[in-house]
Amino acid sequence: GYHIWHCGGHDGAVRADGALGQYVISILDKDMVVVMTEATLGNGRDQRRLIWDVLLPTIKDEPLPVNKKDYQLLQKKQAVYKLPEVKGKASSAFASNWENKTIELGKNPFGWKSLRMNFGKKEVMLTVTETTGKTYELPFGYKEWKTTSMDAYPPYSITPVDRFKGLEGPYWVAGSYAWTSKEEVQLKAHYVNWVSALEM
C-alpha cells in the first residue's frame, strides 16, 4: 500500500509513498505524474530533488514538437538499459576457504540461520537456511544476472505485522557477483517482483 502526502519541493505536488522507494508524484499544475520504483533504503530525497531541479525546469505548457531523431535515440538507449552487475573478478584462490562451508548467522531481520557458498566457473550458488529449517538456493552470475524463483519470502527492511499476509510466491530473484578484492566476494540480489534488494 501507499501513504499519501503533500510533497515538498513544489507547491501543489502530492506523492504516494510505498516501501523502499516506490513513488507516484502528481504535479497538478503541470498535469504531470512521475512514477519511480527502486529498491533503496534511503528516504528518496535525492531522487525527488532530481524531479524539482532537473526535470521540472524543462517542463513547458505547450506540446513538444515532434523530434524523430531524439525519439530514435531514446529507443536505442532504452533497448540497452540494464541493471549494472557487480564489478570485479570472476574468481579468487580465496574461494577455497569458503567452499561448501556453513556460515552460522546471528539473529537477523531476514530470519536466516546459516549460509553456504559453492563456487562455479562463473557462478556462485548461495544456499540459505532459515530459522524455520527451510532451505533454498540463490544463483549469482558473473557479468550477468542469474535468475530463479523461490517460495520463501524475500528480505524486507521493515517488520509490520502480517507484512506478507495475502501474498503468495513465487518470488523471482536475480543475482550477480564478483570478487572485489582477493579476499572479498560481493553478492547482489534483486527481488524483481518485490520491492527489495540485498547486498552481501
Predicted segments, located by residue:
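Charged/polar, low-hydrophobicity segments characteristic of intrinsically disordered regions
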Residues: G1, L64-N67
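Active-site Gly/Thr loop motif
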Residues: G1-M36
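N-terminal, helix-rich and Lys/Arg-enriched segments in bacterial and organellar proteins
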Residues: V34, P63-L64
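A short acidic/small-residue loop/turn micro-motif
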Residues: T40-G42
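Surface-exposed amphipathic alpha-helical segments
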Residues: R49-P63
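Peripheral terminal and inter-domain segments
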Residues: K68-M200
